[in-house]
Amino acid sequence: MNFYVTSGTPDYMEKLIVKNPQQPLILLHGNGNSVVLHETDKKSIFAVPRKFEVIAQDGQFTQKGYFTFFNMPIMSDERPVFEKKALDVIPALNSNDAVIAYRLLRPVKAETYLFIIQWGGPASYEVWKDSNEYKKE
């Protein structure tokens, strides 16, 4: 499965969503910038996408909730060790009722992995961040 991420101004990203109603796109707004997520087995509809392969997943992203993005630059020779450690975190997320969905993403043409987790809300993320599970990871 391919996963694409693009970013831009809120206005432009909203127009992208309206222009592609048939696509499963998720629009997220942040500090003056917006991000659109697209998961598909086809080519990207974005002009300038960041392309990833999905290596672990659960649930379906929805427009509601709170998203955390973990960007992790990993050199190519360190990828196998990193992926094993990252996959070891998955059972803790699977057992967390506050997690709506997640994707662990391997970069296709870059070195920065992306781990996106959707939570029920910011308080859910804060509780997890303060937990022993998070601290040991």
Q: Predicted segment positions?
A:
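Short S/T/G/P-rich N-terminal loop/turn motif that feeds into the first structured element of a domain
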Residues: 1-98, 110-112, 124-130
